[in-house]
Amino acid sequence: IMKAAVVKGNSKVEIENFTISDVGSNELLIKMQSCGICGSDVEKVFGKYGQPSMRLGHEPAGEVIKIGDAISDFKIGDRVFTHHHVACYSKDCHECSHGNETMCKQYYQSNLNPCGLADNYVVPEWNVLHGGVLKLPDNVSYQEAALIEPLACCVRAWSKFKYQKNDTVAI
């Protein structure tokens, strides 16, 4: 049984129990050590988010505590950051081929179970096999690793700017 933070109404968060039967052959079970609280999490709690999942936390880092039979790239005890969703990145995918990976259908089918803000969570096969789990160097703390996804959002936004030398920008 795992415990996870779940939105249960307007401005109400509860801890809910989840049962995961086992880890699939290409899945990982992670003990969460740190998890960021994103603007979308805050919106789920206090706003009108309107998404089907009201589970919280998608910026987690933790320790591998169980591995599927077919996994050889990770071992128990590895310190990792896990992406909450992973797009297909196919040139045949309209969204991915136009730089809109967060709109990819596969992206929405690849979430952590039950969520990142849980004592333990399962990383699905798609994420494991498509680069959604990163081993952490020893000099990166779990707290720093929980900032990987927000930093990636900033880098992505910056890369979309069409700025030139001598332009004025607001930060």
Show the residue positions of the predicted features.
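Small residues (Ala/Gly/Ser/Thr
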Residues: 4, 62, 154-157
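Short Gly/Pro-enriched turn/cap motifs at secondary-structure boundaries
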Residues: 8, 19-20, 51-58, 109-114, ...
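Cytochrome P450 core scaffold surrounding the K-helix E-X-X-R motif
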Residues: 40-45
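Glycine-rich beta-strand-centered segment in the early N-terminal region that forms part
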Residues: 21-35, 48-94, 134-137
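Residues that mark the start of a beta-strand
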Residues: 3, 27-29, 168
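A generic structural signal for well-ordered coil/turn residues at beta-strand boundaries
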Residues: 14, 24, 116-117
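Extracellular beta-rich ligand/substrate-recognition surface
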Residues: 6-13
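NAD(P)H dinucleotide-binding glycine-rich loop of Rossmann-like/cofactor-binding domains
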Residues: 89-169
